[in-house]
């Protein structure tokens, strides 16, 4: 498994706490994790990052770099659509 795959959590339709738990497990092993989402899942990605940063503040996690953008995707009817994307870095604070 590549480093890119291990340090990235893709947000979908699972319960919010499933993504929070997955991110915290990854942060126990590596110093930073990227949370990625697109379209309607962007709000969930922001919620995951905020839960980790605010609720585990004493554990030493913070939000790092945030990247926003868009991707062109072809819809089922053959038209090209632009879909918004977000990537949020959550990292362990240095002791």
Swiss-Prot record:
Acetylated. Acetylation at Lys-13 decreases DNA-binding affinity. One of its GO terms (biological process) is chromosome condensation. GO terms for molecular function: double-stranded DNA binding; RNA binding. It comes from the Archaea. GO terms for cellular component: chromosome; cytoplasm. InterPro entries: Alba-like_dom_sf, DNA/RNA-bd_Alba, DNA/RNA-bd_Alba-like. The modification N6-acetyllysine is found at residue 13. Keywords: Acetylation, Chromosome, Cytoplasm, DNA condensation, DNA-binding. It is found in: Cytoplasm; Chromosome. Belongs to the histone-like Alba family. Binds double-stranded DNA tightly but without sequence specificity. Involved in DNA compaction. This is DNA/RNA-binding protein Alba. It comes from Nitrosopumilus maritimus (strain SCM1). The lineage of its organism: Archaea, Nitrososphaerota, Nitrososphaeria, Nitrosopumilales, Nitrosopumilaceae. The gene is albA.
């Amino acid at each position: 498994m590549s480093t890119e795959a291990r340090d990235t959590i893709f947000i979908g339709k699972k319960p919010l706490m499933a993504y929070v738990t997955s991110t915290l497990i990854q942060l126990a092993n590596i110093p930073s994790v990227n949370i990625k989402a697109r379209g309607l899942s962007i709000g969930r990605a922001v919620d995951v990052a905020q839960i980790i940063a605010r609720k585990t503040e004493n554990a030493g996690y913070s939000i790092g770099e945030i990247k926003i953008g868009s991707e062109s995707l072809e819809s089922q009817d053959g038209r090209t659509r632009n879909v918004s994307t977000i990537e949020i870095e959550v990292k362990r604070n240095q002791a």
